[in-house]
């Protein structure tokens, strides 16, 4: 492995529809336990083509020792992509794929997530492991909770070159982060995902008869003047469910997770502030000791005696070790992820609340 990491030319990811179905089935069947696996395919200049996937065996919670909780089983499942047994399993399966003349190049791995909660230390370590072996390796994240609402959530990520360099040096101190200008926004790079179907499947989809049109399509006015000039024609099949005023349960859960991440962020911030107070006290003690030793040496010099060593403070005082800022960066990145989800969820809710407010106000 090279000492420096080169910038990856990968700009987008193409995933076969069959692979999407396999990943979705594996993640949903393992829910709420994290599901992980390997993805194989090929890289074509700036495009990664994912043509197959391999499920990693996970620890059955029922067979785990009684002293282990379900959280421990999830932690083992999250660390599965870099375990020695699964790496041997991956190599053996890729060997079998190569024997039947199938794309057998490991291009990354995939994992399941719940409500966008995937920016963890296990995710970073897994992706770093794959990128050390292959700089073009990617990570596919399938959000089971979002996908259960009839909207596929499949995203592709990789670690930035700057973050990989900092992770290799393991220097996540305040001074180093200020020098390299590395922030939580520079941890992950998201790439667009394109679902690819075979020509046979595409032909079949085009042969499926489309549903009959129910009246003319409603045109949404673009301005208030257009609305006053041409009133909107209400379709004969109004969607009453869209007027439901109940708050989306996913919005409530995301807000709870957002508050937990903010609390974890403030805990990390308090730990760093405690370190700064400890460092200030120790440096004040060292400064006082050096001033006292300087006065003693001046008196000894006047008495024509040998001066005492000035570096003895290194043995008497021990400066506190600065805690790593990596956890704080991951928490900040997760807070940003939750904030984007809340922003997306509140679009419909805010419109409903304004509609209710307008109907309650008297003219």
Curated annotation (Swiss-Prot):
Location relative to the cell: Cytoplasm
Keywords associated with the record: Cytoplasm, Initiation factor, Protein biosynthesis
SMART domains for the chain: JAB_MPN
GO biological process, one term: formation of cytoplasmic translation initiation complex
Superkingdom of the organism of origin: Eukaryota
PROSITE patterns (alphabetical): MPN (PS50249)
InterPro entries: eIF3h, eIF3h_C, JAMM/MPN+_dom, JAMM_MPN+_peptidase_M67A, MPN
Family: Belongs to the eIF-3 subunit H family.
HAMAP family per UniProt: eIF3h (MF_03007)
Assembly description: Component of the eukaryotic translation initiation factor 3 (eIF-3) complex.
Protein name listed in UniProt: Eukaryotic translation initiation factor 3 subunit H
Species this chain originates from: Pyricularia oryzae (strain 70-15 / ATCC MYA-4617 / FGSC 8958) (Rice blast fungus)
């Amino acid at each position: 492995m090279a000492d420096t990491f080169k910038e990856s030319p990968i700009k987008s990811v193409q995933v076969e529809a069959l692979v999407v179905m396999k990943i979705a089935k594996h993640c949903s069947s393992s829910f709420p336990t994290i599901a992980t696996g390997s993805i194989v395919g090929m890289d074509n200049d700036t495009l990664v083509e994912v043509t197959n996937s391999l499920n990693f065996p996970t620890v059955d919670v029922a067979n785990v020792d009684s002293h282990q909780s379900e959280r421990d089983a999830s932690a083992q499942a999250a660390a599965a992509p870099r375990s020695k047994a699964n790496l041997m399993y991956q190599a053996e399966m890729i060997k079998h794929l190569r024997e039947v003349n199938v794309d057998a190049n490991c291009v990354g791995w995939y994992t399941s997530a719940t409500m966008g909660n995937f920016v963890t230390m296990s995710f970073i370590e897994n992706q770093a492991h794959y990128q050390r072996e292959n700089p073009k390796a990617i990570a596919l994240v399938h959000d089971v909770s979002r996908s259960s609402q009839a909207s596929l959530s499949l995203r592709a990520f990789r670690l930035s070159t700057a973050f990989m360099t900092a992770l290799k040096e393991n220097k996540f101190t305040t001074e180093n982060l200020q020098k390299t200008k590395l922030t939580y926004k520079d941890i992950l790079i998201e790439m667009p995902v394109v679902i690819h179907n075979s020509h046979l499947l595409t032909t079949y989809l085009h042969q499926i008869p489309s549903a009959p049109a129910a009246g003319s399509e409603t045109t949404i006015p673009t301005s208030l003047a257009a609305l006053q000039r041409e009133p909107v024609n209400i379709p004969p099949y109004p969607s009453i469910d869209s007027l439901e005023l109940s708050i989306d349960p996913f919005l409530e859960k995301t807000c709870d997770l957002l508050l937990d991440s903010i609390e974890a962020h403030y805990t990390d911030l308090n730990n760093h502030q405690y370190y700064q107070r400890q460092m200030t006290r120790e440096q004040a003690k060292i400064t006082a000791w050096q001033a006292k030793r300087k006065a003693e040496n001046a008196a000894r010099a006047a008495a024509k005696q040998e001066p005492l060593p000035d570096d003895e403070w290194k043995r008497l005082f021990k400066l506190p070790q600065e805690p790593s800022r990596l956890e704080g960066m991951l928490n900040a990145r997760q807070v940003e992820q939750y904030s984007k989800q809340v922003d997306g969820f509140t679009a419909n809710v805010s419109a409903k609340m304004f509609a209710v407010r307008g109907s309650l106000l008297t003219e």
